[in-house]
Amino acid sequence: MEFEAVIGLEVHAQLKTESKIFCGCSTAFGASPNTHTCPVCLGMPGSLPVLNKKVVDYAMRMALATQCSISPYSRFARKNYFYPDLPKGYQISQYELPIAEHGHLMVDTDQGKKKIGITRIHMEEDAGKLTHDSHRPVSRVDLNRTGTPLIEIVSEPDMRSPWEASAYLKQLHAILRYLDICDGNMEEGSFRCDANVSVRPRGQEEFGTRAEIKNMNSFRNVERAIAYEIDRQSTLVEEGGEVIQETRLWDAEKNRTFSMRGKEEAHDYRYFPDPDLVPLVIDEAWIEQVRGLLPELPEERKARFLEQYGLAQDDAVFLTSAREMADYYEACVEIFKDPKQVCNWVTGALAALLNAKGISVTESPISAQRLAALLKLIKDGVISGKIAKTVFECMETDERDPEAIVKEKGLVQVSDSGEIESMVQEVLDACPEEVEAYRGGKKKLMGFFVGQIMKKTKGKANPQTVNQLLKEKLDK
């Protein structure tokens, strides 16, 4: 029997506000435990929440960027459950009346563009954090994170493979980063994803029983966890078993999911409107004000890069996947007006450098201005492309302009045709057998001759001049 996967994602994005959603405590990451707290986020009797307007602005930006309809009237609700990191005994969230609904994203798949629906976006507060002692039966509670603002983005169950889910998730991540409302750090938990996965016989309309997968802290782990769960459920159904509705945790080391608890339904949380918060009313003027603040988003920028710079699809996708990378590329093109040459270096040498060091482009030791200066040296014939790679490596630790590095290390290209011609003649005189073989039809020996000349000049001879003079002499 052939099975089809049905996947929906719930994404929690921690918003980059300086203060929490319902109080003035700092949201800064990494502070000493329980130092960014107050009576409101600790749930002390008599303390009252006050909504942070910046949180609403940020939620509206995400709603507009994902084609959602913003509700003119929404309301906060209490989600009731007990856990040690939830001091009030409930979480303030939104339930029946979220801030935004009915959006979508268009994602790239192997079959072309696919529309993934977004059911809703709602605002809520984060819970605290538990750490467990590995040597003693002790758990510690840090409530610094309690009350940190989140938006939850709930997709429709429109994805059919781990790769579609990953593509959707990466696009959401990019949009949040472009909007500058979330730093997207999955390891620190500011961008978290839960996956609802079920399987059904291909062609069947009715959904199967779903399992919710948690604890996936990278795009790769999201793919692996969903792939495992699809395989687990398919095997179970094929063998006559029954899928249980439950929450499962992903174990990246063992490459499997395992049962955590039975999956709760909405009624288990006893949602009801929060009596301490008035309903949120949003008028058209506010929506248009926020719309005017939206930047160029990833898909729009990618389309512009394809048209304006004539880039290949894969290159445009890579360059626009992060706002900082796209900014770096355009800053370089602004100075050195050869978009494809800049693209080759950014997607090649620069990307390799960033990967090797495990850093982002904002931390690159080579600025866009210095890279543009290096490319200008190649264009002006001061150095060859091969020497440029050596200079690029030097620029990782040397903060000077590339021109100064080239001069100090004596890397200026030999372009004098008379000087190169004498070297060409020396090489040909020293290799009579190879010359005869070349003239006898072994044209691949041209690479051998070029290599010999480059060896004599330590790679500094102008390759175009070398090739031209060699052809003239060998084809006589």
Curated annotation (Swiss-Prot):
Q: Which reaction does it catalyse?
A: L-glutamyl-tRNA(Gln) + L-glutamine + ATP + H2O = L-glutaminyl-tRNA(Gln) + L-glutamate + ADP + phosphate + H(+); L-aspartyl-tRNA(Asn) + L-glutamine + ATP + H2O = L-asparaginyl-tRNA(Asn) + L-glutamate + ADP + phosphate + 2 H(+)
| Assembly, per entry | Heterotrimer of A, B and C subunits.
Which NCBIfam families does the protein's record reference? Answer: gatB, PRK05477.1-2, PRK05477.1-4, PRK05477.1-5
Q: Per UniProt, what is one Pfam family of this protein?
A: GatB_N
Q: Which GO terms describe its biological process?
A: glutaminyl-tRNAGln biosynthesis via transamidation; translation
- The superkingdom of the source organism is Bacteria
HAMAP family xref list? GatB (MF_00121)
Q: Which organism is it from?
A: Desulfatibacillum aliphaticivorans
The residue ranges crossing the membrane are none
Keyword tags? ATP-binding, Ligase, Nucleotide-binding, Protein biosynthesis
| GO MF annotation terms | asparaginyl-tRNA synthase (glutamine-hydrolyzing) activity; ATP binding; glutaminyl-tRNA synthase (glutamine-hydrolyzing) activity
For the protein in the UniProt heading, the enzyme class is ligase
Q: Which family does it belong to?
A: Belongs to the GatB/GatE family. GatB subfamily.
EC numbers on record: 6.3.5.-
Does the UniProt entry include the keyword Signal? Answer: no
In Swiss-Prot or TrEMBL terms, this protein is called Aspartyl/glutamyl-tRNA(Asn/Gln) amidotransferase subunit B
